[in-house]
């Protein structure tokens, strides 16, 4: 979750502003900010914690928490159709195939006890607004990668699973970047974000690669960063740099509670002895 938030903040200033060929660019500057990626991720975390604790289902908390948090931060950079959705007290999902479901799904990968649960929760977090098959697939793919990384699976095993069930993942970043540009469609942004994780050497390198790709910089850094967190962990020094850009105490409280309940409590030190078994 922190991995998604840091990626979002770091990528926020580079959207539509091509980075240099080098990966050596500042991650945090005066104009950096959290965007809709962070707001909706926090909303999903709050909803899943509520649903897990109450055993009364997740759909109603997801709708309510997304509307609450998005209305609280209405200028965070939401798309027009999603804005109409969260401003309406009652509105159905609207068939979006955008990457909004994948960018907010990371809590599902952490809160789940099994891969099947992670995938089921990911679908629920998507369908309340983004019910197109592309959007659902993207959310499930990202949550699956997070869960498998949490379990200590090697990148090769994670990639093999994702190729088998979701995306081709045959193009390298060097092949993607020359002709790549901004897109927020799931099928044209989520596989590329996953590839940033696959080629990243640590958490920071992963989000730098996602920004360097020159696509949907904040969202792709959030997606790649969410997977990289589960694999590498997030350096505390980097989180401390990002923290001043995070919202108010209520937002920070949800993040803190989620880590206390579902990440720190599971003893994830990120010093994994990774197995190399097939998934």
Residue positions per predicted region:
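Structured, active/binding-site neighborhoods that engage oxygen-rich ligands
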Residues: 1-279
């Amino acid at each position: 979750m922190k991995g998604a938030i840091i990626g979002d903040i770091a990528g926020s200033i580079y959207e539509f502003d091509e980075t240099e060929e080098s990966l050596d660019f500042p991650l945090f500057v005066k104009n950096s900010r959290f965007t809709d990626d962070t707001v909706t991720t926090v909303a999903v975390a709050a909803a899943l914690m509520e649903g897990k604790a109450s055993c009364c289902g997740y759909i109603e908390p997801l709708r309510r928490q997304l509307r609450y948090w998005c209305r609280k931060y209405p200028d965070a950079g939401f798309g027009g159709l999603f804005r109409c959705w969260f401003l309406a007290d009652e509105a159905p999902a609207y068939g979006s195939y955008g990457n909004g479901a994948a960018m907010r799904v990371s809590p599902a990968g952490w809160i789940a006890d099994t891969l099947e649960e992670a995938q089921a929760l990911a679908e629920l977090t998507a369908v309340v607004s983004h019910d197109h098959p592309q959007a659902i697939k993207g959310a499930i793919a990202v949550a699956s990668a997070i869960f498998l990384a949490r379990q200590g699976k090697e990148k090769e095993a994670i990639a093999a699973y994702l190729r088998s069930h979701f995306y081709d993942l045959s193009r390298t970043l060097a092949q993607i970047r020359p002709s790549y540009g901004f897109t927020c469609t799931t099928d044209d942004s989520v596989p590329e974000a996953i590839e940033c994780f696959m080629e990243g050497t640590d958490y920071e390198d992963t989000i730098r690669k996602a920004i360097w790709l020159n696509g949907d910089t904040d969202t792709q850094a959030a997606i790649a960063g969410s997977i990289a967190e589960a694999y590498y962990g997030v350096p505390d020094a980097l989180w401390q740099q990002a923290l001043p850009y995070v919202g108010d105490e209520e937002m920070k409280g949800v993040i803190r509670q989620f880590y206390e309940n579902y990440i720190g409590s599971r003893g994830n030190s990120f010093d994994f002895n990774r197995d190399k078994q097939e998934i």
